[in-house]
Amino acid sequence: MARILFLTDFSEAYARNLLLGIARYAHAVGQAWSLCRLPLSIRDKFGIEAVIDLAKKMRADAVIGQFYNTDNVELFARNGIITIAQDFKARFTTIPNITGPHFLAGKMGAEYFAKKGFRHFAFYGTRDVVWSDERMQGFRETVRAANPSFTFSALCKNTQNALWDYDTNQLVTWLQSLPKPVAIMACDDNHAYHITEA
């Protein structure tokens, strides 16, 4: 029986659906896999070494998780543990990544709004986070290719702050400065909530 640890934020639907999809796959191929959820607080409080120690104690075959690019993920391989990174901040070059078509998501958003007749577009996201950057790139490039007279604006927070932290006053000022009517794409649901709360 394969033992797989998940180190991710299970308050997000993406992580729960990822776990569900892997469980369904294991069932569909007739595999008996033991799937264990680990909170990110283990990594954040005690470091990646604590995750590795826990994985060794649990005799884990693999760890799928959100890792910082400063985490020494090669330590997993040295201990015979397969490691797969879930999109978090940046992709890894040394281990496989679970990722999505983020550029395409941005493109689809821009195409949808353009078909609705919008001429002013804006993007709200987080800078230096792979999924936010690629969604903005797809959104912006599609807007610019559709019509050079379309306007585009972006507000992207720095990643130095926690992903959930935002400046309400800055967001309100930016929203008020946008030409109306405006089509706004947020990089994720949390950022969309920020807009509706502002």
Give names to the regions the model predicted:
Residues M1-A62, D71-A198:
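Bacterial carbohydrate/catabolite-sensing allosteric modules
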